[in-house]
């Protein structure tokens, strides 16, 4: 499954970009960006279907998180911030769809 290597490498790069966007948003709102991992277990596997399923569930959670955040940012009235987070939201939606299609194969 060599195509998975490229997929997950792209996801890593996208995640780093998203983290920088969110960190900037937090700082812009006078917050303090911290790194604290949630308690969701990390699944270690060589089963590609399991990898894709775990990634799919993670991306769905990200989509839901950004879906909840966007209206809050819209209330603030900061269109630049809204636009940057909306791009992340759309990226996450695209990832969900890509993973859904990969799981169908």
Sequence positions of predicted segments:
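Conserved alpha-helical segments that form or flank metal/cofactor-binding pockets of metalloenzymes
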Residues: 2-36, 98-103
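Acidic/histidine-rich alpha-helical segments that form the ligand environment
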Residues: 20, 24-25, 41-95
């Amino acid at each position: 499954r060599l195509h998975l290597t490229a997929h997950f490498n792209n996801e890593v790069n996208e995640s780093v970009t998203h983290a920088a966007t969110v960190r900037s948003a937090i700082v812009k709102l006078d917050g303090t960006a911290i790194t604290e991992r949630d308690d969701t277990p990390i699944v270690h596997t060589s089963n590609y279907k399991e990898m894709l399923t775990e990634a799919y569930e993670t991306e769905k959670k990200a989509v839901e998180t950004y879906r909840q955040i966007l209206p809050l940012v819209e209330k603030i009235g900061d269109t630049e911030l809204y636009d940057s987070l909306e791009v992340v939201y759309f990226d996450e939606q695209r990832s969900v769809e890509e993973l859904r299609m990969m799981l169908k194969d």
